[in-house]
Regions:
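Extracellular beta-strand/beta-solenoid scaffold signature
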Residues: 102, 145-157, 183-206, 302-312, ...
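Residue-level detector of functionally pivotal "anchor" positions at catalytic/ligand-binding pockets or at interdomain
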Residues: 584-608
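Right-handed parallel beta-helix
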Residues: 86, 164, 173, 237, 245-277, 281, 285-286, 317-328, ...
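Sec-dependent N-terminal signal peptides
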Residues: 15-24
């Protein structure tokens, strides 16, 4: 068989496998036609408990960035310059570090300050850093520096202080960026202190300056706020709606219906950065007098008496990483908090203060912490596989607003944390913390992610709020959400889980599941009453009096995806990017189909039970039968 014919055969075989898996996906025959929680949201009922999460994602969920697999076609469309690492000294597959070539490109893009000699920031780099097919090493022990006096070894981050830049490979099955050796910790006693290998960032100059004092109140879902003077605010600006308050009433309201506990110094301490801290990043849509109108709904009620204000948000935009795989060497015998090599030695990438930026079609193999979006807004990660040796964490939105994490398949392997002697190697445990959120995050969506059997969604304390876990599946381990005792609660108001499919539990976990463990100094899980709709799979007994809503437990509900339903309702139709995303086959075995068995009309429905138009391409349900519509 010729090479071309063989390749065609493999592609057709893969396509057939994908289509067969999708068409034979399990259909839930007992699904509700429409769950009451959705009806109350649509009708804006007095007892509605759902926030509008549809503004999460790139350009508020309306579209995706320009997508071309051919780097030169992409560059032409965008008006960018391509910097091929091989043209600057990188040699793939030679086992030698290619860091110097990458540094040459950064310097060529940014230039240096003639006075200080430091690299310049580049807000609009308009550059694509391209890694052709092959394996490239961007960190090895040879890249470390050693202090001549103390002999301390330091690993240094590759900082890209720029916007409008894309790091692109030839495909995640073709381009591999490798961490050959661990990133050394700044302090071995601080287990998370190893730096990232690559950080694409704004360094924060001009951030957090007060622009106006908030004078009016607002409810969750409102789109505007009254301020004292709006003269420093402009249409199109990105700003922070900000609160830091030690007011005892504010703390009491924030923790209601629970009381503050002595261990909670983050929310109840006297330090400069302690107290109730809300950071809701917004783009300015319009200004009418001293009323500031946002593009997005406010996700936290505003009481001006507590000292709310509008602040600057320093950031860059349009940063992307796509079509490659990061490879590390996470320990074969990972144990949580066993040491710095376990918790953070291999952290390939983070974004810091980026807006409308993305990671797509990027895989992670044997990584400690896969990807962190920190102080970002409306960024996304879509279509990612996590495999190899398990590590500390997956993908998180940290101190970020309206991010979107979708279609992550996390099935890394290793040992249970209770297996102190490493006697039984297990597959599909997943990262210790699965996809999720951390710190003062708000409005983020984790969508159709599938994580391992010994994991749970991450909710890493320090005041995250208003998070949606939508159509996700995987383990549901108690006490796995993360966060130090002084940073609790793990999650404040408006934790929402929609159609979660529980695939594994720990038989040794307490029953019933506690959302607010009463023990003050050893209560490692505390979240305000959550909203669960359509929680199904393995049975979990919940304490109902610790929940805001537990609707239709044991059943999948319609709409299948809350994010999709809200976005479709807002825009009038489902955007093409989300239609395409639903057909992504990473982790295809986890696909669930919900059939609206009451529909006897001739309408065509997608796999979430939502009506779609005649131009929809993919697997659909019509008159109770699954079929292909159009061509994938």
């Amino acid at each position: 068989m010729g090479q071309g014919v063989g390749l065609l055969f493999l592609l057709m075989k893969k396509l057939f496998t994908i289509l067969f898996a999708a068409l034979s996906a399990t259909t839930s025959l007992h699904a509700q036609t429409t769950t009451p929680a959705w009806q109350k949201f649509v009708n804006n009922a007095d007892d509605n408990v759902l926030l509008d999460f549809s503004y999460a994602g790139y350009h508020h969920g309306t579209e995706q960035p320009v997508d071309e697999r051919d780097v030169y076609v992409l560059a032409k469309k965008l008006g960018y310059t391509v910097y091929n690492v091989c043209d600057h000294g990188a040699i793939p597959n030679d086992g030698i570090s290619d860091r110097a070539a990458f540094e040459k490109i950064i310097e060529k893009i940014c230039g240096r300050n003639k006075t200080t000699g430091k690299l310049n920031a580049k807000p609009e780099a308009k550059a694509i850093i391209y890694f052709p097919e092959g394996e490239y090493i961007l960190h090895s022990k040879d890249d470390n520096t050693t202090n001549a006096e103390t002999r301390k070894v330091t690993s240094n981050t590759l900082n890209l202080v720029m916007g409008y830049v894309i790091i692109k490979g030839a495909g995640r099955d073709k381009t591999f960026i490798k961490m050959e050796d661990p990133m050394q910790p700044t302090n071995p006693n601080i287990m998370y202190s190893s730096p990232k290998m690559i950080s694409i960032r704004h360094n924060g100059g001009g951030d957090n300056n007060i622009l106006a004092k908030v004078t009016g109140s607002a409810k969750k879902g409102d789109m505007s706020i009254e301020v004292d003077y709006a003269s420093k605010i402009n249409v199109g600006d990105w700003v922070k709606l900000f609160l830091l308050s030690k007011d005892k009433n504010a703390i009491k309201e924030e923790l209601y219906p629970y009381d503050v506990q002595a261990s909670m110094s983050n929310i109840n301490g006297s330090g400069e950065k302690e107290g109730v801290n809300v950071v809701d990043r917004h783009q300015i849509k319009a200004i009418e007098g001293n009323r500031v109108i946002f593009e997005e709904p406010i996700m936290h009620a505003v009481n001006p008496a507590y000292g709310w204000d509008i602040r600057t948000y320093a950031h860059y935009e349009e940063v992307g990483v796509e079509d490659l795989t990061f490879k590390g060497k996470a320990k074969d015998n990972f144990h949580h908090h066993a040491g710095w090599e376990d918790d953070g030695a291999y952290k390939p990438l983070d974004f810091m203060r980026q807006v409308n930026s993305w990671v797509r079609r990027v895989d992670f193999v044997s990584i400690s912490e896969c990807m962190t979006f920190s102080e970002c807004a409306n960024c996304f990660l879509l279509d990612s596989e996590i495999s190899g040796n398990r590590g500390h964490s997956s993908v998180r939105m940290q101190y970020s607003a309206r991010g979107f994490i979708g279609k992550v398949w996390d099935h890394s392997n290793g040992y249970l944390n209770d297996d102190k002697n490493f006697t039984e190697y297990k597959e599909n445990l997943g990262q210790y913390h699965a996809c999720g959120i951390s710190k003062q995050s708000i409005g983020n969506v984790i969508w159709q992610c599938h994580w391992g059997d010994d994991s749970c969604f991450e909710s890493h304390a320090t005041q995250p709020r208003a998070s949606l876990f939508d159509q996700c599946c995987g383990g549901f381990m108690q006490f796995r959400m993360g966060g130090d005792i002084n940073q609790l609660p793990n999650h404040l108001d408006d934790l929402t889980m929609w159609n979660f499919n529980c695939l594994a539990t720990n038989p040794n976990d307490p029953v019933p599941f506690n959302w607010w463990v009463k023990n003050t100094w050893n209560g490692w899980y505390k979240t305000l009453p959550p909203t669960l709709v359509g929680f199904h799979g393995k049975n979990v007994s919940f304490k109902e009096d610790e929940m805001k809503l537990n609707e239709n437990q044991g059943k999948e509900v319609l709409p299948g995806s809350l994010y999709e339903a809200q976005l479709t309702r807002r825009l009038g139709s489902t955007p093409q990017w989300l239609i395409d995303a639903k057909n992504i086959t990473t982790g295809i075995e986890s696909v669930k189909t919900i059939e609206n068995t009451n529909n006897t009309d001739n309408k065509t429905y997608d796999l979430n039970g939502m009506p779609v138009g005649k131009n929809y391409k993919g697997v659909v349900v019509k008159k109770g039968k699954k079929m292909l519509n159009g061509v994938i």
